Structure formats: C-alpha cells, structure tokens
Amino acid sequence: MHWSMMTSSTSTCQDNGESAALERLCPDLANWPLSWQVAKDDVIIGQCIIEILKPFLHELLRQHLADRTLDRHRDHLWMLGGEIIRRRHDDPELCKQPVKTLLLNLIEEEGGPLIWPRISESQQNAFDATCRKLYRFLRQGETR
C-alpha cells in the first residue's frame, strides 16, 4: 500500500475517533448556541463560539484527563459562551468586535470574567482555571 494512502486512512480514523470522543463529552454541543440565545442573531454568534472552542475541546481530550475534569471544563466552556452572549447584550459596543477578539478580551492569564448571576468563589476559581487553560491554548495557536 502506498504511504500516502496509509497516512490518509490513519488520519481519517483518528479524526473519526476524535469526533466520537467529542460527541461523548459534549452530546449537546450543537445545541449550546440555542441555550445561550437571547435574540435571533445569537445563534450565529454561538456557532462561531463553538468553532473557536472545538479545537480546545479536542486538545483536552488528547490530554487523557479524568472524566470529571473533562466534564468540569466542558461545563465551564458552556458558561463562558453564555457569558459572551450576555455581555454582548449588556454592552452593544461588544457586538462590533469579532467573536474571537471578544473571547480573548474576556479571558486572560489570571482567568475569566466574573460570571453573572454570581457563582460561589470556589466555582469562580474553577471556572477561572478553565479560562486560563483556554487562554494559553488560544495564545499558543497565534504563535504557530
């Protein structure tokens, strides 16, 4: 068998495996934009958020983290997406920013935005840990 054919089929199997793992972790990922929706155009923005988050979710899966850790990161990413939509409605100026720019402005080396309605300090700290990880991942992607 030709080498390029072998790598192509291996890559396809790997992609299918990653897609299946992502489906197990986030069976409702396609519905996240609807769960965040306040206005009609929020679904499109939500889909953009999902496209930004998917590579990070795949990276988390490649790290072979414990199921509870993966679930926690997944839940925090869902919260972050909802917070992005909420903030766009609270501050119309944010609607002018591309979604990735807005996301990168909300997260930083220290963590993520304060969630509203308020969550406990320990919940916010856990959320911040996910945001720090996402921040590092997105910044590394910019330097590649």
Description of each model-found segment:
Residues 1-144:
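Charge-rich, intrinsically disordered N-terminal extensions
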